[in-house]
Swiss-Prot record:
GO cellular component: tRNA methyltransferase complex
Species annotation: Shigella dysenteriae serotype 1 (strain Sd197)
Entry's family note: Belongs to the class I-like SAM-binding methyltransferase superfamily. TrmB family.
Main function: Catalyzes the formation of N(7)-methylguanine at position 46 (m7G46) in tRNA.
Protein name per Swiss-Prot or TrEMBL: tRNA (guanine-N(7)-)-methyltransferase
Family matches, as PANTHER family: 3-DEOXY-D-MANNO-OCTULOSONIC-ACID TRANSFERASE/TRNA GUANINE-N 7 - -METHYLTRANSFERASE, PENTACOTRIPEPTIDE-REPEAT REGION OF PRORP DOMAIN-CONTAINING PROTEIN
NCBIfam families per the UniProt record, alphabetical: tRNA (guanosine(46)-N7)-methyltransferase TrmB
Gene3D superfamilies tied to this protein: Vaccinia Virus protein VP39
InterPro entries cross-referenced by the UniProt entry: SAM-dependent_MTases_sf, tRNA_(Gua-N-7)_MeTrfase_Trmb, tRNA_methyltr_TrmB_bact
Pathway: tRNA modification; N(7)-methylguanine-tRNA biosynthesis
Residues that, per the record, bind S-adenosyl-L-methionine: E69, E94, D121, D144
Enzyme class, spelled out: transferase
Length: 239
């Protein structure tokens, strides 16, 4: 598995500049289980970054709706979703190798064949490897909120990124975001509402209740006990 992760900023035309990371490298140490998973299961479930567009039917061995999850953490929710929806295919992207290893181990334990993972910057993957109009859903759950005002530009949800996601969604495809930081939720809502071609699926034109399809994470359960909120946003590509 190659480990070459760079996150770009965008120029005024939406082209990526290799400057600003939307994440911090927190590689940490691999457990023996994660190391074993990377060595043994990556050749089967891992996808190396390249500048060639993916052929999803060839990758998964069938024609099926594809969900892309960006930043899957340790992979527990992604594996649960792939297990619950065997009729769909899932591609997960995560920049931290311990998380990739943990996800591979869980996916192998569940015997999943409808999940593949990548360890690379998601923006570059979207630009170089994801065909236009190919995704049923893009999921972005609990991205780094970059709390400090001077770091807000590092937030991954910006207009050029949301436009890029829209180009990869099929008509009727959905971009689903979730955050536990209300100012970031407000930022997401402002960005998404400014883009022509997206429809907010919220009846109140802001946030949606957590859909049953998104598992509650342990982190989220702890937040609920402490009285912390979570905001889900779902926007459909309508043109």
């Amino acid at each position: 598995m190659k480990n070459d992760v760079i996150s770009p900023e965008f120029d005024e035309n939406g082209r990526p500049l290799r400057r600003i990371r939307s994440f911090v490298r927190r590689q940490g140490r691999l457990t023996k289980g994660q190391e074993h998973a990377l060595e043994n299961y990556w050749p089967v479930m891992g996808v190396e970054f390249s500048e060639d567009m993916l052929d999803f039917p060839a990758l998964f061995g069938r024609e099926a709706p594809v969900t892309l999850e960006i930043g899957f953490g340790m992979g527990a929710s992604l594996v649960a979703m792939a297990k619950d929806r065997p009729e769909q295919d899932f591609l997960g992207i995560e920049v931290h190798s311990p998380g990739v290893g943990a996800c591979l181990a869980s996916a192998h334990e569940e015997g999943l064949s409808n999940l593949h993972v990548m360890c690379h910057d998601a923006v570059e993957v979207l630009h170089k490897m994801i065909p236009d109009n190919s995704l049923r859903m893009v999921q972005l759950f609990f991205p780094d909120p970059w709390h400090k005002a001077r770091h807000n530009k590092r937030r991954i949800v910006q207009v050029p990124f949301a436009e890029l996601v829209k180009s990869k969604l099929q008509l009727g495809g959905v971009f689903h975001m979730a955050t536990d930081w209300e100012p970031y939720a407000e930022h997401m809502l402002e960005v998404m509402s400014s883009i022509d071609g997206y429809k907010n699926l919220s009846e109140s034109n802001d946030y949606v209740p957590r859909p049953a399809s998104r598992p509650v994470t342990k982190f989220e359960q702890r937040g609920h006990r402490l009285g912390h909120g979570v905001w889900d946003l779902m926007f459909e590509r309508v043109k």
